[in-house]
From Swiss-Prot:
Endpoints of the signal sequence: none
Protein family membership: Belongs to the NAD-dependent DNA ligase family. LigA subfamily.
Cofactors required: Mg(2+); Mn(2+)
Gene name in the database record: ligA
Organism: Wolinella succinogenes (strain ATCC 29543 / DSM 1740 / CCUG 13145 / JCM 31913 / LMG 7466 / NCTC 11488 / FDC 602W)
Name the UniProt record assigns to this protein: DNA ligase
């Protein structure tokens, strides 16, 4: 094989792979593909300097990884607002029509898999990252390169983020499950978990065997000038990506509803697991004008499928004690399959709900599950009772520690701060992804450490030794050292993570970030007036925070010394040239919008969504729309990132 023949072989192999994996229309037999593949591979081994970057031999390579690096998205990967019926869809659309009465929409199936963000630069795939928290994910580029439906190169030289869902078709999922059972491995709970787990394999060779597919559903940062989302997605198809055959452009909500009804009817027979339909405004200019709420874009929603209802046997009801002391009844079920997931537990919410439903141990019950929602019992089949079913009495004492329970309206709470269940669940929260994110310290390991008497409170984690870990079942030298390194690695974490990790009732991630920005390391030293003055803080949140900080003052100080969290850089108002100023942000900037919102608010500025005469500044990036024009008309000072930097340095 000479160089010209090699180039032709690579072109032919990629065309065959595209026809097989993307178009589902094979152009060659497996034997023909394998023969040409090995001829190309032989040429590459003899001429390593001539290896083509798009060669299929380059998809799988590299040693197994020790772990995944973090990767920032150029633009945030947002969650979507959910709508559950036609009435909610109509309300969502009517809000849009008030601003843009002639808006059109694009409807896509919502695939139930693992979201992935592909970054291409100068036509080459340079990074693939998981969604993560929407701003920062994990770099899984080596694994993504093994997925045949992800082009290693595209005919677009400008930088672009292409977003989509990594899925396993139902048929391939069943084969994977059978294979795992033959190998005495635990089966996956559902295709989504299988896709996510496959994408996060440290060994790319394992990922390559999993029959993953990448189906694009959108873009992040991009250079397109077209005014249509639908046309952008058509461009991706021309680059070699899979087309969603059900993608439809709609002109009103009745057309949207017809597409939705069709998808619902095809739900069980569709080759890939679906959990709804995504509806987007097609016009890019309208999308920019509509913008985002704190959590989601205003120009798109997820129209969820109806819950699937199944009949199941309720074997028993157990009582769980959470970190706040709330005792929750949980139904243990005879396992039943719903949408590829084996369900063996369901929530009963509280004891008033049990009384209302008249659910008893041993009942046959009607069970529903919708998307990621925890399975829920909606009614018992009373006519099927044999008389042996047992009603559950409302408990008076904690099932874990035996202390007397307190009734607070519909909730029943254990007040014992030393209750083992409360401590364990507090530790689990402390180490969780939304808190200190201690890798390798999950629920089972915490349970093991707790039962062995090695940890009883947060501080004990920092006193663990390799010797104490090696005495536990399942711990070898490397696993013990990795856990110790992960625990020590939380030193210097963001302050909001530290605050969230404390598990203060009513204080979640969002509130923790506000406290971090407003007060820094003195968050626990504030009075009622200061706390209640924060946006979004009500009386209940303020009282909960103040009481927790009063009771745990010394402990917070000790933990601050141990963990040394980093507070956002704060300038006092007199130091900040933009303190008290009002900002509007528009266009595509070099970092996600949230980065600039946090920067500006930390410097005493206020960020608002719309331009008015009262606006002091408009910060604009590329493709700034009508907000920039309006700001100039109103005489609002318009600055780009470079000019903002000059203002802050002045």
């Amino acid at each position: 094989m000479n160089p010209d023949q090699y180039s032709q072989a690579i072109e032919r192999l990629n065309a065959w792979a595209h026809a097989y994996y993307v178009l589902d229309a094979p152009l060659a037999t497996d034997e023909e593909y394998d023969q040409l593949y090995h001829e190309a591979l032989a040429f590459e081994r003899q001429n390593p300097e001539r290896i083509h970057p798009a060669s299929p031999t380059q998809r799988i390579g590299g040693a197994p990884l020790e772990g995944f690096q973090k990767a920032s998205h150029l633009e945030r990967m947002w969650s979507l607002e959910d709508v559950f019926d036609f009435g909610e869809l109509k309300s969502w659309a009517e809000r849009l029509y008030k601003q843009f009465p002639h808006a059109t929409f694009v409807c896509d199936p919502k695939f139930d898999g693992a979201s992935l963000n592909l970054l291409y630069e100068e036509g080459r795939l340079v990074r693939a990252a998981t969604r993560g928290d929407g701003l920062i994910g994990e770099d899984v580029t080596q694994n993504a390169r093994t997925i045949p439906s992800i082009p290693l190169s595209i005919p677009l030289l400008e930088r672009i983020e292409i977003r989509g869902e990594v899925v396993i078709p139902k048929e391939d999922f069943e084969k994977l499950q059978e294979e795992r059972l033959r190998e005495n491995e635990s089966p996956f709970a559902n295709p989504r978990n299988a896709a996510a787990g496959s994408l996060r394999q440290l060994d790319p060779a394992i990922t390559a065997k999993r029959k993953l597919r990448f189906i694009p559903w959108g873009v992040g940062a991009h250079p397109f000038k077209t005014g249509s989302f639908f046309e952008i997605m058509k461009s991706l198809e021309s680059y070699g990506f899979i087309r969603s055959p059900e993608r439809t452009r709609c002109h009103n909500i009745h057309e949207i509803e017809r597409v939705y009804a069709l998808l619902v009817s095809e739900r069980s027979t569709h080759p890939v697991m679906l959990d709804g339909m995504v509806v987007r405004v097609d016009e890019i200019a309208y999308q920019r004008e509509l913008g985002y709420t704190i959590k989601a874009p205003r120009f798109a929603c997820a129209y969820k499928f109806p819950a699937i209802e199944k009949k199941a046997r309720l074997l028993s009801i157990t009582l769980q004690v959470g970190r706040s002391g709330v005792v929750t009844p949980v139904a243990n079920l005879e396992p039943v399959e719903i949408e590829g997931a084996m369900i063996s537990r369901a929530t009963l919410h509280n004891f008033d709900e049990i009384k209302r439903l008249d659910v008893r141990e041993g009942d046959w019950v009607s069970l529903i599950r919708s998307g990621d929602v925890i399975p829920k019992i909606i009614q018992p089949f009373a006519h099927l009772r044999s008389g042996e079913e047992k009603p559950l009495s409302r408990p008076t004492h904690c099932p874990e520690c035996g202390s007397e329970l307190l009734v607070e309206e519909v909730l029943i709470k254990c007040q014992n701060l030393s209750c083992p269940a409360r401590i364990k669940n507090s530790l689990i929260h402390f180490a969780s992804k939304k808190a200190l994110n201690i890798d390798g310290l999950g629920e089972k390991i915490i349970e093991q450490l707790f039962e062995a008497g090695l940890i009883k409170e947060f501080e004990d984690l920092f006193s663990l030794t390799k010797e104490s870990l090696l005495s536990l079942e399942g711990f070898k030298e490397k696993k013990a050292q990795n856990l110790l390194d992960a625990i020590q690695g939380v030193r210097g974490c963001d302050l909001w993570r530290f605050i969230n990790a404390l598990g203060i009732e009513h204080i979640g991630e969002g509130a923790a970030k506000k406290l971090s920005h407003a007060f820094g390391l003195a968050f626990h030293l504030q009075n009622h007036e200061a706390i209640i003055g924060l946006e979004g803080f009500g009386e209940e949140m303020a009282q909960s925070l103040l009481e927790f900080c009063r009771v745990n003052h010394e402990r917070i100080e000790h933990l601050l010394g141990l963990i040394e969290p980093l507070a956002p850089i704060q300038l006092t108002p007199q130091d900040s040239p933009i303190a008290g100023k009002s900002f509007v942000i528009t266009g595509t900037l070099s970092a996600p919008r949230e980065h600039f919102v946090e920067l500006l608010t930390s410097l005493g500025a206020k960020v608002v969504s719309s331009v008015s005469k009262k606006s002091d500044f408009l910060l604009y990036g590329e493709s700034a729309g009508s907000k920039l024009e309006k700001a100039r008309e109103l005489g609002v000072r318009c600055v780009n990132e470079e000019e903002l930097g000059e203002i802050l340095e002045s």
